[in-house]
Structures are given as structure tokens and as C-alpha cells.
Amino acid sequence: MKNRSLGQIGTQISCIGLGGMSFSDAYGKTDTKQTHDILSSALDLGINHIDTAYIYGMGNSEKRIGEYFTKNKGSREKFIIATKGGIETGKNGERRFNNSKSYLKKSLEESLRRLCVDQVELYYVHRREAERPIEEVTQTLSEFVKEGKVNQIGFSEISPSSLNKASKIFPIGAIQSEYSLSTRYPELGILQKSEEIKATLVAFSPLGRSLLTDKPHNIKKAQTLNLLKENPRFLEPNLSHNIKITDAFRELASDMGISSAALAIAWLLHKGKNIVPIPGTRSTKHLKSLSKGSEVHLKPEELNEIDKILPVGWAHGDRYSVNQWVGPEKYC
């Protein structure tokens, strides 16, 4: 597994990271053993970057990772950890964005406790509180670095203009955005701005929430998952179209002797040297399969073929439901 630099300070992380949302029950029931098996498999494959967040299972993802570190002595030093804060939950499960200094400080300290660590490499604001100036939030994050609790800071789902403002206050280590063959929105500004300020673009949902895998979720499966049951791309008639058009992509991957997931990851890695995809999975077999994308060198003609099969805008339906769009910053 090759490495890439995280942010301006050059921390070396694997070119493929591991998304920790799957360590909660977001994509189906997951237990601690599954999580620990995935973490061990990641180390065996050379994957050393874990991305998690409080909101993933209300701390459950972080807790399971922390339990792994406690159980497996020396494993903590082998991983480069990122987590996130800024989304507050109420007694009845309601959510709101809170980027205040007091709340972010409290969230970070609780994350460190669950992870059983004294410091994380990267701390993101998961969603921006629109009413609070991003300059103020960036200043808060910078203080966590000075306190030694965080090595680098980042933001998830912000616009290029917000990123530009933040970068003038303190160096931004990473930006997290959904980016894949099915969602190419970052190419309209955030990819260029991240390159300009030397921030890493961490791509979540790099497999199109299953559409770019060998076995995309059918409507029955999608309706059992809270994240997908209202997602326009996984509602009919959009889903049938999206599965049909990606069939040719699966055939191309098969002809190349790799899985569709590996090809989707390889494509992303070819889009920029500062891009690090963070797929999530509950299967060690799937992790091994997609990790092979790091070994694939795509020729110009292969990249052209992929663009013909899945041209920009091919996916029917928005990437988020109306409710899910509350928080991410739209631009362009």
C-alpha cells in the first residue's frame, strides 16, 4: 500500500483510508468482533488511516476502535486517526449543528476518551453551523492543535469560499467531501481549492454507496437502511437506471481482472495526488478486494473508457434527500 501526505505537514497515511461509519449500524448490524477483524485486516493490508466521528452510532464507532487499541497492545501507534465533532444530539435523537468553542472542546475530549488516546492526527468540524463565522471556528480548532490534542484540523462538506476563509486563519490539513464516479461535485471547486492550499481531499462514499460495487443494493435492501431509504438515487425509477448503467462498469472491471470497487478506488486515486478515499465495509473480504485499487495503474485509454461508460451526471437522483441536505454547503 502506497502512502500519501496528509496536509501541509506531511504526515504519511495510506493512499486508501478506512471509513468508520460502518463500525456503527449505519449499513446493517455490526458487532465489536466484526469491527476488530476489519481493523486487523486493514493493518495487514497496509491501511493505517481510520476516519470516524461521534455521530457514527453516537460514539459507538469510536468506542469500538478504542476497545481495539486496548485489546491489541501497540496497535494505536500503527494508525493515523481522524474524528469529527460539531453535531449535537438531543434527548430524543434530534440533531443540530453546534460549532461553539465550548461544545467542540467537550466533543473532542469525549472522543479522545472513547478512542482511548491522548491525541488524534486530524479533527474535523463535521457540519458547519451556518450562523457562526468560519474564521471563529477555525480559531477554535487551532487552539486544539496548540494544546497538543490534535495535530491537524479539517472541515467536512464545506464550500470552496468557506475553505478559502478558513485557510487564511490556520493551515487546513484536510477537507472531506463525497467524491466518486457517481458524485463529481468536488470537481467544480473544492478539488481545485484543496490543491491550492495543499490540503488533502478525503473522499467519503467513494463507491457510490454500493452503486460502484459488484453487488449494488437493490430496492429491498436500500429500504432497510436509514441512510438510503429516502436517498433519491436509491428510489425507483432512479435505482433501476443507476444499476443498469453501472453494469457496463462492472463488466469493464471484470475484464481487467479486478472488482468494481477496486476500479472505482483506482479511478479516484488517479484524479489527484492529494486525494485519499475512505471506503467503509463490514467485510474483510470486501476490504481486501477494494484495496487492490491502490495497485492499479489506469492507462489513458482506460480512463477514457470509464468516462464513456459513466459520463459526468450519469446518476439519476440527487446524492442526498431534502433532509440530508441540511448542513452540507452547496456551491456552483
Model-derived regions: residue spans:
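Conserved, mostly hydrophobic/aromatic
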Residues: 6, 18, 35, 50, ...
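N-terminal binding-site loop/beta-alpha segment at the start of enzyme catalytic domains
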Residues: 1-79
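Active-site beta-loop-alpha junctions enriched in small/polar residues
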Residues: 21-23, 53-55, 84-88, 125-128, ...
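Terminal-tail/helix-coil boundary detector
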Residues: 1, 196, 224-251, 255, ...
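Aromatic-lined glycan-binding groove of carbohydrate-active enzymes
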Residues: 186-224, 259
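Glycine/proline-rich, positively charged
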Residues: 91-182, 189, 200
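N-terminal small/glycine-rich loop or linker at the start of catalytic domains
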Residues: 8-27, 82-96, 119, 124
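Structural preference for beta-strand elements that scaffold enzyme active sites
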Residues: 13-17, 48-49, 78-82, 119-122, ...
